[in-house]
Amino acid sequence: MSEKKSKLLILYSTVDGHAKTICEYAQTKLKKDKDIVIASLDDDSEQKLADFDEILLGASVRYGFHRKNVYEFVRENKEELLKKKTAFFSLNLTARKPEKASPDTNPYIVKFLKKVDWDPDLKSVFAGRLDYPSLNCPNRLAILLIMAITNGPKDLSKVHDFTNWSKVDEMIESIRKL
């Protein structure tokens, strides 16, 4: 008789789709071991957290902040989250710098978790992707200015992917063991 799979809810909040890409990658890697439902925080369909054993929340940062729906989700579901095994990852370009690539040193994940007063069982941070060609002109210029100040990439014709997929795989293995 096989062991019953745990139920994992994977939720994401994304601006440009990369948080979704990472969550779908995690789903693919974990589907043999867990029963998984994946959904966007932007979807109208509300998942009942009580139906799941574990929750992974992935969220991107834009202009220094996680999206409003991430703050709202954690605040509105804090009581239920505290009863579950939880994992959270933040996706931000600041994490491309080694000194800001850990959950303890990345200012955006530190600030977010403090503000919502949540301490997930597993925390990760990834540098993500900068897709200049898909940005509209005002966003492209704003991010170009930020990259100029922070010594980041300035080639507007390219997609710059800083995702450390080995770190993503490490997070997935940790989730497998939750």
Q: What is each model feature region?
A:
Residues 33-45:
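A short beta-strand-loop structural module common to alpha/beta enzyme folds
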Residues 3-33:
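N-terminal beta1-alpha1 ligand-phosphate binding loop
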Residues 21, 50, 68-72:
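Generic recognition of short, well-ordered alpha-helical segments
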